């Protein structure tokens, strides 16, 4: 029998590690305080501070305020609201079910509350939405795990149409209800009908840990269907259907939601958020302009990098191909004139035209016509460009692509030489707000015109931004969802690319920052160096094992990059004289802790 020796020092170390971890878990109940950057909100708004998604919403739009901190904590004040919600945590983007996150969703909270007047109902705990829930009205579910309240008593049987039973989670007993509600919901204008799921704790508590995933497992056993998670946030809510709540205060000096992989908690930065689709719970369709991850295309510097390839295209014919070893694809197409396109390995490109009847140049994702945008997404673009000259009678700058089955040509127009009008766009279908501005939505019909499938009759879909811009983020998926809500059917994706199109004139276009992401090519999300969850990771056994691994002496050449959850981010090249941190910063933009691997050795690298 093979035996293993264990030294006394290793046993002592393991015991100390376990005790430290336990102490940390209990510490926030007695020693919690707000820390980090903060933002104070006084009207309905969603946003991000650090890697924390937050929202303040009340039915009046002016019935309170909230201060959100970059450590996840928040301070919520009600001055006079019919229904008030204050929440912070994970914005998940409706991409995965709770089973697909790679671990359990865990919430920690510490609550300090003061009494409010005229409280009809109040829910303090966990809150979120799910999309794509089969068998439910509008495929939406609003869910709650309620651990406390501003009211005199915890919610009772009045909260739901259906009592499903009781469960025991995190040392407490919860009663589970399902309710059918018609009212405001995410991503909808006006009222819609949806289900609500509730876990209501029998005895309220003002501090503790909530295993959100365990509640969802128990809900499923009771026949409640789960969907794709839109969010999971610590919540303070209070309202009254017959008046206003006045004077309530819910302070959360500690609040955190993370995904726990095995024994290692993962901060909210490890889950890709939905960027601008994080619309507020209200009767308005207006969203916000937040960008997933930490990319700021307007400030970050990229420039033209890698091999330069120039093509003059071919009259009345598409010239296409891959952009170096990147995941991107290019295309140039025109009718007449003297035109060209120059593209670079990082996806940036230049284009020029002179005397053309119609000119298109574009770079982005080329798909196989087998999957919908929902299956491929979320799809996002980050860009910075400049333009000169003129572009004739019509022109579009933004996102462009096609779908098949049905055949559709689509545009998201963020910029122009001359703003396109109704004569080019067809029938106005509506408007919505995303990425910080309102877009008007139009549908046109092209009769027997050139297409990716030859000469065809097909619809064109347009989202046209009210104010032009030359840099920022475009949530492509949000536009497509809105089009379908308006009856504009999308098919299987052929492409999604950053485009310049000119209907004449003489001009040039230069994209100096370019990045696109989708499910297959997500935005890198390393764990923040300064987060409190990093302190926990430092004390975890798996991180100790990494520290115990032989440290490598980094040499010039290629090495692989991983985030702290072991997800592969890409391969980068280290040139002689450069530091690894500099190379990581240049390639991934985000500050944080990375793991780099060269040969059989791995090493942690901090990027500030």
Curated annotation (Swiss-Prot):
Job of this protein: Cleaves xylans with the production of xylose, xylobiose and xylo-oligosaccharides.
GH11 domain mapped to chain residues: 40-250, 316-514
S-S bonds: none
Record has Disulfide bond as a keyword: no
Signal peptide bounds: 1-25
Protein's UniProt name: Endo-1,4-beta-xylanase C
Family listed: Belongs to the glycosyl hydrolase 11 (cellulase G) family.
Main EC class the enzyme belongs to: hydrolase
Region (Disordered) residue spans: 263-296, 520-539
Low complexity: compositionally biased ranges: 263-294, 527-539
UniProt keyword terms in alphabetical order: Carbohydrate metabolism, Cellulose degradation, Glycosidase, Hydrolase, Polysaccharide degradation, Repeat, Signal, Xylan degradation
Biological process (GO), any one: xylan catabolic process
Metabolic or biological pathway, per its Swiss-Prot or TrEMBL entry: Glycan degradation; xylan degradation
Superkingdom of origin: Bacteria
The keyword Signal belongs to this UniProt entry's keyword annotation: yes
PANTHER family: ENDO-1,4-BETA-XYLANASE A-RELATED
InterPro entries assigned to the protein according to its UniProt record, in alphabetical order: ConA-like_dom_sf, GH11/12, GH11_AS_1, GH11_AS_2, GH11_dom, Glyco_hydro_11
Active site per the UniProt annotation: 142 (nucleophile), 237 (proton donor), 409 (nucleophile), 501 (proton donor)
One example GO MF annotation: endo-1,4-beta-xylanase activity
Enzyme Commission numbers on file: 3.2.1.8
Catalytic reaction list: Endohydrolysis of (1->4)-beta-D-xylosidic linkages in xylans
